[in-house]
Amino acid sequence: MTDQELLTILKTDLQVSSPALDPYLAKLVEAARDFITTEGISLTSSYSDSMLVEMYAAYLYRRRREENVQMPRMLRWALNNRLFSQKGAVTDG
C-alpha cells in the first residue's frame, strides 16, 4: 500500500476531508511506523501491516486531540498478535 493510499484511509477513519492536515497526518504515519518498529515488529508491505500503521496513526491523532485517550484494545491486541506471529515464525537456517 502506498503512503498516499494509507493517508486516504487514515483521513477516512478520522473523518477528515481537508487537505490542510495532510502534512501532519503524513508525519503521524511516519511516527506510527517508528513506534511500531520500536516495539520490535518488523513491518512488511502487506495490507495487514499497513492497516496496523493506520490504526496506530489514528490513535496518535486522537490521543493528541483528546484528554486521557488510552490505546484501544484492538490496537494493542493487533500489535501483540503481530509481534507474537513474527517471533513464533519458523525460519530456515
Spans of model-derived segments:
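Conserved short "hinge" loops at termini or chain/domain junctions
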Residues: 1-52, 62-65, 83-93
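Domain-level detector for trafficking modules
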Residues: 65, 69-78, 82-84
